[in-house]
């Protein structure tokens, strides 16, 4: 099957990869966690070991560095935070146009839920997954799942 036979989403995915991801304290800029791993791969459940102190931060700055062969007209992410399979939070991020054959860094800020809604790390540990759907407009590129462990 040639690339002309592939659907748009599959064609983008074939030339797409996440190079690294960094989470920072949004107030201080201090790096809390970083990983050089392609979290966009849809065929496996990924794991991330994140310091427990991330749960006490007011906001987290997330940087995603990615490369793409194909142009994307409206690159965006939909993320669902699930606890034991039930949606706790849902976030929507839009980057917009991405040029072909480029490497890009995308920074987003995620504010914490109110303290009254937070659960302890020992309850969350291993029971939280983040389901990320990568889109170009309405075309699904990939859906990945990352299970969180707090250390």
From Swiss-Prot:
Database matches in InterPro entries: Ig_E-set, PDED_dom, PDED_dom_sf, Rhodop-sen_GMP-Pdiesterase_dsu
Any one cellular-component term (Gene Ontology): nucleus
Pfam families from the UniProt entry: GMP_PDE_delta
Keywords associated with the record: cGMP, Cytoplasm, Nucleus
Gene Ontology biological-process entries: sensory perception of light stimulus
Subcellular compartments: Nucleus; Cytoplasm
Gene3D superfamilies: GMP phosphodiesterase, delta subunit
Family membership: Belongs to the PDE6D/unc-119 family.
Assembly and interaction partners: Interacts with Pde6.
The protein's name: Probable cGMP 3',5'-cyclic phosphodiesterase subunit delta
Gene source species: Anopheles gambiae
Phylogenetic classification of the source organism: Eukaryota, Metazoa, Ecdysozoa, Arthropoda, Hexapoda
